[in-house]
Structure formats: structure tokens, C-alpha cells
Amino acid sequence: MKKWIGFAALLFAAITQASQELGKLHYLSEEYKPYNYTDSAGNPTGLAIELLHQVWKKTNTPPQTITIMPWARGYYLLTQKPNVVLFATARTEARDPLFKWACPIGYAEIVLIGLAKNPLTLTKLEDAQQHTIGAVRADVGEQLLLNNGFDEQKIMAANRLPQALKMLTSGRVDLLSTNKTTLMDLIASQQLDPAQFKVFWMLSSEQFCFAFSHPVSDELVKEFQNGLTQVLASSEFQQIQHKYFPVP
């Protein structure tokens, strides 16, 4: 009996320590609806936000502050600070060794999308190099282009996706490189006609994750991943998913 009590005490201490350490991390995100964004009251919300709150519950971590900022700023802090969690971050081949990861939040298609009325023909990705392309600065859409040898002088970077969409609709760029789901959500929220837009190329299908600064301990990331895995298998997650991605 004493041995069992001792083991239980050690287990409780370990869980408490993990929750305390998870509470020392800085949680950063961006306006990227429906995964993460601010509601009309200015509070962070979205699928990834609610998922994170469920992970905190599973790991006995008190709710933490979530800071919404431009993606490029959050990505910079992730590379420079020792205790940052940035989400939802696409886990690309180029990014994989730079950070530690807890996955998945979800999956997304990164596409080149333009106005349907424009007579663009892409038979191979290199054909897109003839056109001016917009992207969110430091976003996966921009990084995939650079990784594929695109001239950064032909990539017009915006701080936020609404700015990038405005560049497309005003004719400043021919294509946008971005997450298809997020862009179509933005198009709907701005009451634009989805039929005016066309996907000309799919760059990649990526997994969205929580990215941790590399100095964060493996044990802490594992603790977070364990909590995330439990949440993803729960009925609570099914409800969250149906809320933001309702089945037709």
C-alpha cells in the first residue's frame, strides 16, 4: 500500500511539473480562419484554439494567454526565442529539422489560385514563374515557392491574407500561393463569389501542427503530444471539427 501511495505521489508530481512547464511557454498564432482567429469580441478562437484548450485540460495546464500577431512576426519569434509555440504551422520538409512538433491539427492543400477570368495556363510548376505571385510573408505558401526556385523579386509578400487577397482582386498579382481552405473561407466572409476564383496548381498537401522552439525539451513536447493524441481521439474533438468543418 505504501509503495502504491509513493508511486501515485511521484506520478502526480510528474504531471504537475509537466503542466507547470507547459504554462511557461508562449503560445502564438495568427489570423488564419477557421483554424485560429479573433472573434468580434477580440478573443482568440477557431479549431486550433479550441483544440489547444482541450490539450491544456488533458495535461492539467491552466489556460494560458494566446497572442495573435502577423505570421512573419510569430515565425521570427519561434526561431529566436527558447519557449515559443506557434500554430497552426505547416510541417514541411524544409521546416521539419528547425523545430519540434506536436501533430496534427489538420491537413491543408497549398495551392496557386487566381481569378477564373484570367487566361492562365500552367502545364508545369515552372510555368508559374512567368507570373507575379502573392503570398503571406514567411507563410508556407511563400516558402514552398522559394524552395522550388522561384525568384523572390516576383513574389509580393503581404502581412496578412486579406491583404494578399486584395492584391489578387485588384490585379496587382496574377496568383496567390496559400491554403485553399483558409482562402475560400475568407472569400466567403467578404461575400465574394467563389466562382470568380480558380485553382491553377496544387503545390503541396501539408500537415498543420503545433511548432515548438528547438530548445523546448523533448519530454515537454512529448507530454503535449500525448495530450493532443488523447484529444484527437475524443468526442470533444469531433464536436469541434464539425463546428468549423460542418459535414454538408
Question: For each of these PLM feature ranges, what is it?
Answer:
Residues 13-15:
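N-terminal signal peptide c-region/cleavage motif recognized by signal peptidases
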Residues 20-97, 157:
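Extracytoplasmic small-molecule ligand-binding "clamshell" domains
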Residues 29-31, 108-111, 188-225, 247-248:
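Periplasmic-binding protein-like
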Residues 33, 42-54, 116-150, 156, ...:
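Bilobed "Venus flytrap"/periplasmic-binding protein-like clamshell domains
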Residues 46-59, 139, 210-244:
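Extended ligand-binding regions for polar small-molecule ligands
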Residues 52, 73-77, 164-167, 173, ...:
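Short, hydrophobic alpha-helical packing/hinge segments within bilobed ligand-binding/sensory domains
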Residues 53, 65-127, 140-141, 199-202:
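Acidic, polar ligand-binding/catalytic clefts
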Residues 62-65, 140-156, 195-196, 228-248:
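Ligand-binding clefts/hinges and TM-proximal coupling segments of bilobed small-molecule sensing domains
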